C-alpha cells in the first residue's frame, strides 16, 4: 500500500482495517474502523479532505477524490463502493450501496439506505 503525505497532511485510519498491497492513499484522508480498501483503489485527499466512516468496503479500482477548495468528500458508515466506481466531491450517508462502475459527482448527496445501480451517473443535487 502506498501512503503519502501532501502539504503536511497524512492519511489516518482506525482499527482492524484491510488495505490491499497496491491501494494508494494520499493526503488529508481519515478512514474509520473495520474498513477494507481493495486492489488498485486510489483515495486522494490532495486538494480537499476525505472522510470515510466505519465498516466501509471500497472495492477494486475505485477512485475517491475531492473538489479543489469547494467540496470535500464524505462517506458514511456501512457503505459499500462497487468495483471501478468514482466518488468525487460528494456526500454519501450511512447504509449505502454504490454499484460497480457508478460515478457520483461534485456536490451530490446520497441519502441513507440508498442503492445506486451499477453504471449510474449521479450529478449535483
Predicted stretch roles:
Residues 1-15:
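Extreme N-terminal tail/first-helix region
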Residues 15, 20-21, 26-27, 32-33, ...:
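Left-handed beta-helix
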Amino acid at each position: 500500500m502506498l501512503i503519502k503525505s501532501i502539504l503536511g497532511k497524512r492519511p489516518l485510519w482506525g482499527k482492524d482495517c484491510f488495505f490491499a498491497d497496491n491501494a494508494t492513499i494520499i493526503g488529508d484522508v481519515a478512514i474509520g474502523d473495520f474498513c477494507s480498501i481493495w486492489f488498485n483503489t486510489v483515495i486522494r485527499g490532495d486538494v480537499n479532505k476525505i472522510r470515510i466512516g466505519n465498516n466501509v468496503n471500497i472495492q477494486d479500482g475505485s477512485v475517491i477524490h475531492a473538489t479543489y477548495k469547494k467540496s470535500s468528500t464524505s462517506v458514511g458508515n456501512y457503505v459499500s463502493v462497487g468495483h471501478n466506481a468514482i466518488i468525487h466531491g460528494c456526500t454519501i450517508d450511512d447504509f449505502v450501496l454504490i454499484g460497480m462502475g457508478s460515478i457520483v459527482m461534485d456536490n451530490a448527496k446520497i441519502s441513507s439506505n440508498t442503492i445506486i445501480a451499477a453504471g449510474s451517473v449521479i450529478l449535483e443535487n
